[in-house]
């Protein structure tokens, strides 16, 4: 919204609109799906200050910058535990949802400890939304563009990580305008030295426990060695998963 408002201010400053006209429009109540911004743009079109094609370009640019903004409105549990896993399975149907029923023949001891299964590879999916922690307001109002997240040194937070219970992690980073993907084996996670205790309970919160549950805070630069393009997710999981299984 910041970029759109700056563009509208630029258009207004170069238009013939008076301050009184602008103030009158801004004072009027706006209800969804209308907004003060759309009202001003419509007014500018009515005056011939901008063409419909220029309006359409503003709309296209706004949608491109905010194509994943709706994910910031999701409840934490829905986003963190449901959306990421379902999104990956939509991209690659080869991934099997890990349930007792689905794995009865190939992994009969399954007890909910990982999310997806791929030809013997156990996979855990985690997602994190990039947002400013220095301002107040809703999560959506603080959502970062990719460039903003990188420039701010945003640390992606992945929690409830159980490297002893899976072979490969798929981590999704959500920005307003793009999704980022990092694929790493559980061995690679341990080698980062970033895995810290989450202190969830006495059974999984200590490092010497067989099922240690931890969390990481890592910047995009720190995650760079594990970055993959969306179309390469399946191949990366195969490569890292099979390498670990075959050890």
List the predicted regions and their residue ranges.
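Active-site beta-strand termini and strand-to-loop segments that position acidic
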Residues: 116-120
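Nucleic-acid endonuclease domains
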Residues: 1-114, 127-247
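Short hydrophobic-acidic sequence motifs that mark active-site Asp/Glu residues
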Residues: 122-124
